[in-house]
Each structure stands twice: as C-alpha cells, then as structure tokens.
Design a protein with these regions (language model features):
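Anionic group-transfer/hydrolysis microenvironments
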Residues: 7, 20, 64
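Short coil-to-beta transition motif at edge beta-strands of beta-rich domains
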Residues: 1-5
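C-terminal terminal-subdomain/extension
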Residues: 51-102
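Alpha-helix initiation and capping sites
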Residues: 8-11, 81
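Compact nucleic-acid interaction/catalytic patches
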Residues: 10-49
C-alpha cells in the first residue's frame, strides 16, 4: 500500500498490484484505490488499522487502473498473504477470470 498523489483525486492510498520485479522498468503500474465507502460487494477487500492502514477502508478491484509510479510517494504498509489472497479473489470476481466460458 502506497500514498499516491492522484492528479485529479488528490493524495490517497493505493494498492500496487504490479509485481516487484517489473517496477524498475515501468513508468505506469497497476493500482487499486482505497475508499472509505464500504459496500460489502464481492469485488471489495476491507482493510483497517490491523492491516497497517490509518483508517478503515476498502479496496474496490472494479476500479483497477494504471497509475504513474512516480506519483507513489510513501509506503504505508505491506498487506498480509491472507489479505492478498482476498485481493486475488476480488480481482477474479471483478474480471470474471476463472468463470466458465459461455
């Protein structure tokens, strides 16, 4: 989790999904914004202070977007393997990956 200085939305937490090995060679990476609006939907992952976040929030994998690595200004925390498993499940729900072909 990083503080990201979004050009439009201002400073907010983002989860960086791009693998560590690719970061040195990319200008844009995949990020997921955190929001204080929690809707309890399958594409969300709730986070709180026990995860190292300053406030309770949720990652909404429906809002996955490319972000500029240069605007990731400060590391907040590293999510646990359990939370990252939840992120993978929410990402699969957001993209319908793993759903039977129709």
């Amino acid at each position: 989790m990083w503080w990201y200085d979004h050009p439009v939305g201002g400073r907010r937490p983002y989860l960086v999904l791009t693998r560590d090995e690719a970061l040195p060679v990319l200008n844009r990476i995949l990020g997921v914004p955190a929001t204080r609006t929690v809707r309890d939907i399958p594409t969300e992952v709730p986070l709180d202070q026990t995860d190292g976040m300053p406030l309770a929030c949720a990652l909404t994998l429906d809002n996955l977007e490319p972000i500029q690595i240069a605007l990731c200004t400060e590391k907040i925390t590293r999510l646990s393997p359990e939370r990252m498993a939840m992120v993978c499940t929410a990402l699969a729900a957001a993209t319908a990956c793993g759903a039977p072909a129709q």
